[in-house]
Curated annotation (Swiss-Prot):
GO terms for molecular function: ATP binding; tetraacyldisaccharide 4'-kinase activity. Transfers the gamma-phosphate of ATP to the 4'-position of a tetraacyldisaccharide 1-phosphate intermediate (termed DS-1-P) to form tetraacyldisaccharide 1,4'-bis-phosphate (lipid IVA). The gene is lpxK. Its EC number is 2.7.1.130. This is Tetraacyldisaccharide 4'-kinase. It comes from Rhodopseudomonas palustris (strain BisA53).
Length: 340
């Protein structure tokens, strides 16, 4: 689904939906306040305040890489949005498809252990049976089932939190004050000032703000330079992907945005191939979209390129110190709890 335009700014339609937003917000707040199940290992949640893309997946992968450097054994836990399997199941990229486990888990499972489960407690149990020393939740900030030791919230610097209102009046999944109360750190990705008011609000509560940007793979960028491309993406913020291509010096001759987690049909693929062949364009998409496209020989023959992106942090040492401190505090709480 593409988010409505009125979610980005306050408008009459947004105002008219406020009564429904108040009801939705009250239900969401009541749900968030429920105590979650505590487990034997620390749980770090990478989430956001709103629906749509913000950069959670690259953040999750960066966090996992850091945890491995710290001699931890991280396992990613996801609900597998868009997948048919309830789980819990460990994702096998050679056996599973995006239709079964979701595009993000399938993409991440190529480099990190990933468990998919609609029941997050059951998923955490499976992750611990795989000797996880830390569980990294990809999304699930508003879900109360599993108690979280650390909540790292990711916000896009250009989009911020839209009009700051709750669904359906705006993009927020729950009232902002409650979400801020449960935030341990804020990560702002990209250039822009739309997230600054949230950062200021959290700073007043002593919550640190980190900053970073998404960096495309240099070798892939170099290979695409000098070519005109047809860029397509079915992610939370396709425009950010198109902007990343342009900022890298790639000529984007045509754009085709799709809804987030869009299941590509044969007609979609045929239309993309026809346009690319007609205008002499190279097809470029995201790694998430490539996971959903699956095995499409005609796309491979046409030279489809998926552009890998990674999170580049402005203060890697600060991020490292934050994670080490939070893990230490989480384990200390468990030690003190076991002594009672």
């Amino acid at each position: 689904m593409r988010e409505p335009e009125f979610w980005r700014r306050r408008s009459l339609l947004s105002l008219l939906l406020m009564p429904l937003a108040a009801l939705y917000g009250a239900i969401a707040a009541s749900r968030m306040r429920k105590p979650g199940r505590s487990i034997a290992v620390p749980v770090i949640c990478v989430g956001n305040y709103h629906g749509g893309g913000a950069g959670k997946t690259p953040t999750t992968l960066t966090l996992v890489a850091l945890l491995r450097e710290l001699d931890e054994t991280p396992v990613v836990l996801s609900r597998g949005y868009g997948g048919s399997l309830n789980g819990p199941v460990e994702v096998d990229p050679d056996r599973h498809s995006a239709a079964e486990v979701g595009d993000e888990p399938l993409m991440m499972a190529r480099s990190v252990p990933v468990v998919v489960a609609k029941d997050r407690v059951a998923g955490a149990t499976l992750a611990m049976s795989r000797r996880a020393s830390v569980i990294v939740m990809d999304d699930g900030f508003q879900n109360p089932a599993l108690a979280k030791d650390v909540s790292l919230i990711v916000i896009d610097a250009r989009r911020g939190i839209g009009n700051g209102r709750v669904i359906p009046s705006g993009p927020l999944r729950a009232p902002l004050p409650l979400q801020c109360e449960r935030t341990d750190a804020l990560l702002i990705i990209g250039a822009g000032s739309a997230a600054d008011p949230v950062a200021a609000r959290l700073k007043s509560k002593g919550v640190p703000t980190l900053r970073g940007h998404l960096a495309p793979d240099p070798a892939c960028v170099e290979a695409l330079r000098g070519r005109a491309v047809l860029a397509f993406a079915g992610i939370g913020d396709p425009e950010r992907f198109f902007a990343t291509l342009r900022a890298s010096g790639i000529e984007v001759a045509a754009e085709r945005p799709f809804p987030d987690h869009h299941p590509y049909s044969g007609d979609d693929v045929a239309a993309l191939l026809d346009r690319a062949r007609r205008d002499g364009l190279t097809l470029v998409t995201t790694e998430k979209d490539l996971a959903r496209l699956g095995d499409q020989p005609q796309l491979a023959e046409a030279g489809l390129t998926a552009l890998p992106v990674t999170l580049a942090l402005e203060d890697e040492a600060g991020f490292r110190r934050f994670v080490i401190a939070q893990l230490g505090a989480a384990r200390d709480r468990r030690f003190r709890g076991n002594r009672r």
